[in-house]
Amino acid sequence: MTEIRPLKKEEIPLLEEFLYQAIFIPQGLAPLSRSILKEPDLEMYIKDFGKQPDDWALVAEVDDRLVGAVWIRIMKDYSYYDDQTPSLSISFLPDFRSQGLGQQLMTAMLDLLKAKGYPSVSLSVSKDNPALRFYQRLGFVTVEEREDDYLMLCRL
C-alpha cells in the first residue's frame, strides 16, 4: 500500500539519500561519488532542513518503506526564480521509478503549496532528462533555457 504523507522530523536525514538519487546521470556515465553531496551547491538542498519557514517535504511510503520524496525550500540554487518562489526537488529510489508514484507525490506537493499561498514553484531539469515531459504534463513551463538545463516554473 502506498501512502503520501509529510516527512517526519526524525526522517529528515533520509533526504540525503533522496538528494543523491535526484542527481541526473545520463545513460552510460558512471554514478557520482556520494561525497558530491558535501559540495555547497548541493548541500544547500538539505542542510538544516526543517529550520526555515519555507521547508516542506512529502514522502511516498510503500509497505512501511520510504521510496520517494519531494521537498521545497526558498534558496538561491539551480532552480532559483525569485525570493518568493520555492525550489522543488523530487526523487525516487531506482526500483520505484516510472510507477505513477511521482504523479501522486507531485500532485500532493502542488496542492500543499497552493493551500499555503505560494504563487509558483520552480525546478531545474537537465535537457536530456526524461522527466522533462513529466514536469510539462504537470504544468511546468520553461522560463529560461541554459546550456545544459531548463529552469521551469509552475504557476499555482
Range-by-range predicted roles:
Residues 7, 90-92, 125:
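Hydrophobic adenine-recognition pocket in adenosine-nucleotide-binding enzymes
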Residues 23-25, 29, 34-84, 89-93:
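Acetyl-CoA-dependent GNAT
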Residues 89, 98-111, 136-137:
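Conserved acetyl-CoA-binding loop-helix of GNAT-fold acetyltransferases
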